[in-house]
Amino acid sequence: MMPLFFSTICIRKPIVVGARFKYCKALAVALLLLLAFSAGALAQTAQWVKQMGTGGISNGVSSDAAGNVYATGTISNPGLFDSITIPCNASDVFLTKYDGSGNILWANVGGGPLLDQGNDVATDSAGNSYVVGAIQTNGPNPTAKFGNFTLTGHGDYDWLIVKYDTFGNVVWAKNYGSALGDIAQGVTLDPSGNIYVTGFFSSAMTVEGVTVTSKGLFDVFLAKFDPNGALLWLKTAGGTGSDIAHGIVADSAGNIGMVGEFQNTATFDAHSVKAAGLGDAFIAKYDGAGNNLWVQKGGSTTSFAVDPGKAIGADAANNFYITGDYTGTATFDGLSVVNTGTSGTDIFVAKYNTAGAIQWLHHAGGPASDKGYSIGVDQTGNSWVSGFAGSGPGVVFDSISLPPLGNEYIYLAKYDPAGVVQYVKQYAAGTGQDIHVLNNGCLYLNGGASKGSGNEFDNISLVYVDRGGFICQFCETVSPACEPPTGITASSITSSTAKISWTAVPGAMGYSTQYRKLGTTRWKTKESSAALVKLTRLSPATSYECQVATLCSTETSPYSPIQVFTTTP
C-alpha cells in the first residue's frame, strides 16, 4: 500500500507511483528550440550537456575542489551513462562523476527491487559525496543494496544517506524510518565537513538510537552527522498538519537554512508560525548546535492549495535566497505578490538577511501553472532560478515577457543581488531540478527532459528514447546586443484588421508581435520574417495594444514599448 502522502502532497523531487514517476506537473512531450531573453549583457551559455537514461531524472548536483561534477537521481533499466551501461531495477539511485569538460569518469547505481530515489548530493573538497533520498521497502524483499551494504527497511519508505569516495566506492550507507513513509529531501555540508540532512517523517522514527514522533501526518527532521556517519544530533519541527522540508543550505559561518511547507501551526523549537491558508512556505535558520534561531513564513489565504518553498541558497554574506510557488496573493513578512493567472501557480523568489528580515520579493508567471524548483547563488548574491513554466500565453519575469511555446518548458532566470532580473532563457520541455553555482562564472543545471528528439540547450541537441535525466554546464559569455525594433506604427486599420510595421533591425532573423485588447491580460502572438505583420479577426471599435520583439540568431530581444491603436466601427 502506498503511503497517503503520495496522493496528497507534491514534493520537490519526483515521487515514485506505481511503475512510473509522478511529477508535480506532467512534462510536455514536444521539445522546442531555445529562446533567450536579455539585454545583450552577460548570459549563461550551455558548454556541454549530458543525458542520463532511461526513464529517470537527475535531482541533485554538486562539485569538488578539482572541478569535477557529481549528479544523483533516479534511473530504470538499463542505466545508460555515456559509454557506461549498468543493469538496474525498476527504479534505482544513481551517482555519476564527470570532469569539468563533461567526460564521464564513473557511475554507480544502488537500490532494491522496488522504487527508490536519489534526491540530493553534497560533495566535500576531497571528492567524497553524500547522497540522500529514499528506498521503498514494503514488498516481499524489503532490502536495498549499495556497494557491499545491504539495507533493510522499516516500512513503506525509509530515508537514505550514502557516502561515496572520490572513486565511486560506497564507504557507508544508512537508512532510517518508521512504519509509514519517510523521505530525505536535501543534504549540505558545513565548513568542517559535517553533514546535515533534512526531509520529512511520520509516526515514530529512530535514528541511531534516538526516537522522535511526529505531531501530525508529517513532521520536518534535521539531522547532523560527522563525516564517519555518527549522529551528532536530531531535531524535528512541525504541528498537526503535513510539514515537509524541501531544501537545505549551510552558510559560511556553519549555520543552516531550511525551506519547505507547513500547515496549521508549526513549531520550530521556541518559535511558531501559523499558515494563512491551507499551507504556507517556511524558511528556518539553525546554528551548528541545532538551535533554531528564527523562522519566517509566506503564503496566501487560499484554502485549496499549499504554497511551498522548494529550494534555498546562500551568498558569502550569509543571506538566504529561496524560491517556490504560490496561488492567489501571497504575503512574505509584509511584502506581497499577486498571482498573474486565473488558475494555477506562480513562481516566487525572495531574499532574507542573516536576522531573517526579508530584503526583496519577486514573482513570475503566466495564466498556467509555473513552478520554482531550484535556486543557486554566487558569492556576491547573484541568483539563478529554474523549474518549469506552463504552456499557453507568455510568462512574465518582471520586465521580461516570454512568448508562449505551447508546452511546459525548462527556464533559467538570473537575478542580481538587488533582485532585478537580468535575463531568462527557455529550454527543452521538462523541469530544472537543481542548480549548483561555481565561482568562475559557470553553473550546473540538472533535471528531467521529455521523450523526443531535438532537445535543445543553446546549440546542443539531445535525443531521448524515453524520459531521462540531464546535466548541463553553463558559463557566462558576452553576447551582442539584440535590440527591440523601433518606429512601431499601426496603419490600414479597419473594423477587423490592422497592419503593424516597424524599422527593420540589422541582422534580425524575424520578429514576434504580441497584441491584446486594451485592459485585458492575455497576449496573442504572431511571428513574421519581415518588419510587418497583419492582424486579423479584431473586434470593431476596440482599442488594442501591441509590442514587437526581435528574433536574433541566438537570442530574442525584450519587447518594444507598447503601442495603442483603435479599430474602426
Show the residue positions of the predicted features.
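A sequence-level/structural motif corresponding to short, flexible coil/turn segments enriched
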Residues: G40-P480
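N-terminal secretory signal peptides that target proteins for export/translocation
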Residues: M1-Y23
